[in-house]
Structures are given as C-alpha cells and as structure tokens.
Amino acid sequence: MYTIDNRNTTENLLQFLAASPSPFHAVEQAAKKLTEAGFLPLQECEKWDLVPGRGYFVTRNNSSIIAFAIPKKPAPSLMLTASHTDSPTYKLKDKAEMDTFGKYTRLATECYGGMLIW
C-alpha cells in the first residue's frame, strides 16, 4: 500500500511555494523537480523520439509546463491531471501602498481568477 509522509510532503510543498513567487518561478521549479526525477526536457518544435518507460516535459514561454510519462507496457486507460500557474492569485492594486497608523505599510490587493476564500 502506498503511504504519504505528510510532514515531508508539506515541507516540500512549502519549499516549492517559497521558491515560486511568480508563475515563471513555479514553472522553473517544476522543471527542476521533473529533471531531478529523471524526466527529459523536449522542444515543442522538434521531432520527439519517445521511449516507453521514460518521462518527458515541455515548457512554453517559461510560463507553462506539460509533463507526461510513456508506460513500459500499453495501458488500458489514460491518467491525466492538469493545473495552471497564473490563477488564482492576488495582484497588487494601483497605488497599493497604504500607511497603517505610521506603524507599518500594507499593500492593497485584489483577487485574480476564481478562488475559494474561507
């Protein structure tokens, strides 16, 4: 049975988020993690020679990344997961700086994209 080390998983996620202040950084970090896991980068405008049992990834404009693995044996189905790096997020408003009683500065933000806020 597959088990997850929650503490390690959480620490890895927090490190990834800290290293990814923008969508571009997130794509860079994802490519780094994929490379460390043995995935090979592909160029989208070149012919691909894909080998069963290998993983690959493609980036575009340093702002999007797609990763996939070719199974060693033909699979009866396809497993797919997707996400994006640009939304939801908080964006700074125009004239974002707000002085708070001379004690500290706050930044006015707005939600960009659909987000669940509890």
Q: Which role does the model predict for each range below?
A:
Residues M1-W118:
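N-terminal hydrophobic/helix-forming segments and targeting peptides
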